[in-house]
């Protein structure tokens, strides 16, 4: 960020000392809270102390921008300024990406500072107009309040949530949870919670556990007083928010006592009762956790569901980034919601698939929606919210934007009506009938706007009430036109005097600072220098701005008349805005339909434009079916420029191959394989097509993952402890209908302990839970579990190696990997030759040691393999004994016997790994 963009903070000595004294008197704050001070009425901002150093390092990336106030040495306060543009970008990054809190301080009088605005990741109300002014909201900042209770020795979780930025909705839920609170974790994922309000009760064991989950899910924790959860006024408060004709006491949600307690805390935290514009605008909903597939935080990361800061501009690194071809911000928000709320109802999934299929097959309709219609829809929720407040300086412009949406609706409806395929009835129900309803209900709004607003002026980006709507308005407008008619001749006169062609080298312009003025290039600036009739206004990169006394007077007159027109029309504007605000409910409903249409078209677009087009999966009802995928691929990886993706088949069958152990070299594709099955399952339950040639899937109630230790060490948790915590959560929350993904287990402790735990956990899942499970492991000995549990199947990623190199095939095949490729992979990674040689020597030493301590380890071969191999050896030796007696002890004849017997038993030897290895060692 350029230093020249940084404003100068100029304070006299007294003001500087006074501010420093005030600043040092402020209470301490967490590092994750930034204090920003408004300067010159909001023209620019300043930050101080640690916050200034943060800005210098992260925004300007230089300490040269730091200025010290209040003296020198330890007494000095490091300070830094931000232009308004930079401050807005800084706020957006702090709140939406860094998940920091913000305090914006404003000055009253000469030296009385107070907090003017507070904002946090889940409560953006105070700053949303600032940070979203030129940017639509692509994420939903949800804040949730939670309270735990116990009944009949069971843990109950009550929660209430709200999104004040993109929806006017209060949601509540209450459910039983286990001692790892895995259902609560799933709730955080499903709702995309950014901030959680909890009671400040210290020493509560369950509360500490709850906070640990919040931290794992990157949710900001806000503590409030225990009394804020009091429900004394909850009925009247909620009734005021819901509006007339609705009584919360008659709703089933009112009986959820824990949830109502959380609703009380949430209403107080968000200050909903103190803002009349909220009253009568909210609806209450009940969130049913069981309607959607449960995801834990580890699964969200394992499946690359949402973008991470490391992705940068590479959108295809996450599933959201890959699928987000939406043309509207409301579509992007709904896509995020759908990805975190995969459906459990087969009819609902099939209905979505049918709609996606329409746009998948009809190229013309898909292109028409994306290129001609959807891109023209603004965020109607934000527009409705601004209109309800009614105090926006751009209120008339917002009304016009709503009007432009209304007049486009018939075109959208006509484009959709062209479809005449097998899903026509569903198409009619989901889109066409709803659009007809919106067109009918919004017709009076269209008529009112056309009657009251000067739509011709809109073409010149002017937003005003029609002059003929009021006599005084008409008179003022006539005077404005008279002045405007004199402006052009004055500009033409100047052009003639200077010998420059108007609109070529001489420009006639208007802006908010200088009004009407002229501009010529800096090369031609000499033509007006030292000539009194020309008044220079400013020199810019684009040229020199100037005026004349006549032009200045005309511009001033026009400005005054325009101001009078604005004053006269202000009451009419209020009436128009108030009228349009009554349609907010219809606009919100339309917004939801547009978002749904946008996501479905996006699903179809991505499905058809993938390197290999996706196909529609077949799903069975919950509790039935298998996972059979033909040539499945990872949708994100196949989009990478430098990747030629190898597709793999998948076969998870009930009673046959429920628990699959995948062995093979690092970097060989184990992790990708198990993750892509999770991704395909999630996509299918979202209603999207999947990256497979064919796909048969069952409905999973959850995807649970144990992958990598991540940044656990940064939180004071060892790798092993992180593994055990995640695995314990899986064991407690998994069901027969879950999909479990385990990518390595037991690496954080000794080899023998790690193997023992991996074996015990695998056996428990395979025999007790019996969920479909994919376990990628470096413990090759774990494959022996298939001899004890018939539903365990062994797979391996194929690799070809010789003494010098390894070729990773990325192909998953049945059977076990009987060879370690660690040193080969290190060679691929260009490790120094000395390190490689030392590794080989140490590996050889360990192999010798392993020979001596083999009885301590699980057998390398199954009992059946050893028995079959021994039988082959026994038969071979019996035949050799018989045939060798006929060779009379001659060496040449003996070799012929051996060769003949080798050919006889070649097929059996090749099919038994125990014999093959024995021959290699011989």
Predicted regions and their residues:
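Basic, polar low-complexity surface loops/patches
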Residues: 1-340, 347-361, 382-389, 451, ...
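Conserved phosphate/pyrophosphate-binding and hydrolysis machinery centered on Walker-type P-loop NTPases
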Residues: 13, 80, 84, 256, ...
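N-terminal accessory targeting/assembly segments
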Residues: 28, 466-510, 514
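A conserved P-loop NTPase coupling/switch region
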Residues: 44-69, 156-162, 169, 182-187, ...
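Long, charged, glycine-rich C-terminal linkers/tails
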Residues: 107, 116, 122, 278-287, ...
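ATPase nucleotide-binding head domains, primarily ABC-like/P-loop NTPase cores
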Residues: 252, 256, 522-556, 599-922
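Amphipathic alpha-helices that form helix-helix packing interfaces
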Residues: 349-352, 356-359, 376-387, 402-419, ...
């Amino acid at each position: 960020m350029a230093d020249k963009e940084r404003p100068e903070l100029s304070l006299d000595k007294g003001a500087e000392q006074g501010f420093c004294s005030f600043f040092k008197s402020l209470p301490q704050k967490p590092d994750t809270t930034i204090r920003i001070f408004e300067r010159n009425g909001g023209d620019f901002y300043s930050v101080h102390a640690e916050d200034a150093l943060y800005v210098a390092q992260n925004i300007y990336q230089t300490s040269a921008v730091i200025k010290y106030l209040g003296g020198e040495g330890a007494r000095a306060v490091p300070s830094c300024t931000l232009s308004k543009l930079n401050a807005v970008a800084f706020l957006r990054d702090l709140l939406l990406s860094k998940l920091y809190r913000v305090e914006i301080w404003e000055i009253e009088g000469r030296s009385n500072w107070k907090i003017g605005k507070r904002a946090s990741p889940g409560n953006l109300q105070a700053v949303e107009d600032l940070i979203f002014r030129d940017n639509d909201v692509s994420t939903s900042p949800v804040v949730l309040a939670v309270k735990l209770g116990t009944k009949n020795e069971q843990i109950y979780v009550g929660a209430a949530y709200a999104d004040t930025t993109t929806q006017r909705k209060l949601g509540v839920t209450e459910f039983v949870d286990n001692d790892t609170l895995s259902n609560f974790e799933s709730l955080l994922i499903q709702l995309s919670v950014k901030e959680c309000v909890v009671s400040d009760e210290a020493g509560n064991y369950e509360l500490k556990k709850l906070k640990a989950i919040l931290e794992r899910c990157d949710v900001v924790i806000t503590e409030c007083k225990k009394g804020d959860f009091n429900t004394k006024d909850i009925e009247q408060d909620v009734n005021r928010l819901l509006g007339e004709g609705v009584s919360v006491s008659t709703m089933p949600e009112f009986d959820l006592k824990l949830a109502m307690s959380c609703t009380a805390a949430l209403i107080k935290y968000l200050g909903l009762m103190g803002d009349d514009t909220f009253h009568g605008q909210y609806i209450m909903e009940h969130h049913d956790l069981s309607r959607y597939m449960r995801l834990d935080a580890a699964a969200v990361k394992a499946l690359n569901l949402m973008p991470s800061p490391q992705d940068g501009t590479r959108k295809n690194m996450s599933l959201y980034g890959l699928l987000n071809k939406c043309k509207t911000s409301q579509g992007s928000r709904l896509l995020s919601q759908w990805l975190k709320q995969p459906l459990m109802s087969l009819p609902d999934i099939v209905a979505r698939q049918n709609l996606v299929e329409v746009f998948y097959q009809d190229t013309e309709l898909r292109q028409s929606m994306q290129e001609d219609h959807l891109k023209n829809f603004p965020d109607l929720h934000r527009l409705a919210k601004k209109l309800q407040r009614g105090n926006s300086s751009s209120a008339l412009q917002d009304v016009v934007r709503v009007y432009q949406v209304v007049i486009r609706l018939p075109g959208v409806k006509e484009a959709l009506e062209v479809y005449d395929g097998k899903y026509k009835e569903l198409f009619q129900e989901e889109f066409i009938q709803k659009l007809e309803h919106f067109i009918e209900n919004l017709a009076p709004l269209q008529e009112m706007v056309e009657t009251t607003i000067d739509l011709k002026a809109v073409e010149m980006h002017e937003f005003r009430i029609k002059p003929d709507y009021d006599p005084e308005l008409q008179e003022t407008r006539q005077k404005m036109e008279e002045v405007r008619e004199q402006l052009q001749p004055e500009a033409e006169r100047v052009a003639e005097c200077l010998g420059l062609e108007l609109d070529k080298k001489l420009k006639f312009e208007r802006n908010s600072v200088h009004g009407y003025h002229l501009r010529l290039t800096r090369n031609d600036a000499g033509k007006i220098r030292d000539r009194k009739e020309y008044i220079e206004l400013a020199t810019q990169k684009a040229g020199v701005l100037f005026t004349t006394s006549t032009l200045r007077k005309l511009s001033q007159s026009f400005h005054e008349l325009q101001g009078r027109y604005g004053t006269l029309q202000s009451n009419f504007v209020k009436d128009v805005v108030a009228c349009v605000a009554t349609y907010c409910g219809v606009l919100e409903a339309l917004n939801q339909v547009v978002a749904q249409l946008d996501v479905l078209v996006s699903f179809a677009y991505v499905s058809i434009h993938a390197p290999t087009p996706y196909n529609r999966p077949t799903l069975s009802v919950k509790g039935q079916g298998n996972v059979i995928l033909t040539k499945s691929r990872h949708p994100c990886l196949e989009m990478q420029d430098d990747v030629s993706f190898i597709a793999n088949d998948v076969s998870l069958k009930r009673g046959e191959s429920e628990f699959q152990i995948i062995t093979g070299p690092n970097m060989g594709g184990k992790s990708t394989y198990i993750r892509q099955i999770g991704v395909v399952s999630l996509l299918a339950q979202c209603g999207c097509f999947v990256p497979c040639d064919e796909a048969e899937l069952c409905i999973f109630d959850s995807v649970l993952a144990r992958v990598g230790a991540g940044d656990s060490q940064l939180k004071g948790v060892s790798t092993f402890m992180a593994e055990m915590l995640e695995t314990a959560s899986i064991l407690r929350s998994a069901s027969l209908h879950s999909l479990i993904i385990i990518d390595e287990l037991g690496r954080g402790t000794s080899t023998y302990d790690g193997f023992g735990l991996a074996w015990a956990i695998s056996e428990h899942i395979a025999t007790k839970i019996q969920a479909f499970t994919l376990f990628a492991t470096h413990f090759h000995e774990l494959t022996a579990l298939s001899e004890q549990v018939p539903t365990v199947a062994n797979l391996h990623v194929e690799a070809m190696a010789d003494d010098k190199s390894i070729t990773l095939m990325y192909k998953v095949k049945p059977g076990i990997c009987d060879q370690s490729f660690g040193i080969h992979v290190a060679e691929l990674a260009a490790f120094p030759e000395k390190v490689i040689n030392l590794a080989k020597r140490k590996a050889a030493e360990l192999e010798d040691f392993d020979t001596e301590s083999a009885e301590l380890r699980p057998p390398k071969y199954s009992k059946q393999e050893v028995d079959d191999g021994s039988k082959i050896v026994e038969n071979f030796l019996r035949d050799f004994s018989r045939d060798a007696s006929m060779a009379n002890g001659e060496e040449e004849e003996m070799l012929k016997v051996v060769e003949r017997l080798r050919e006889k038993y070649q097929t059996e030897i090749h099919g038994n790994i125990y014999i093959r290895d024995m021959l290699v060692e011989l």
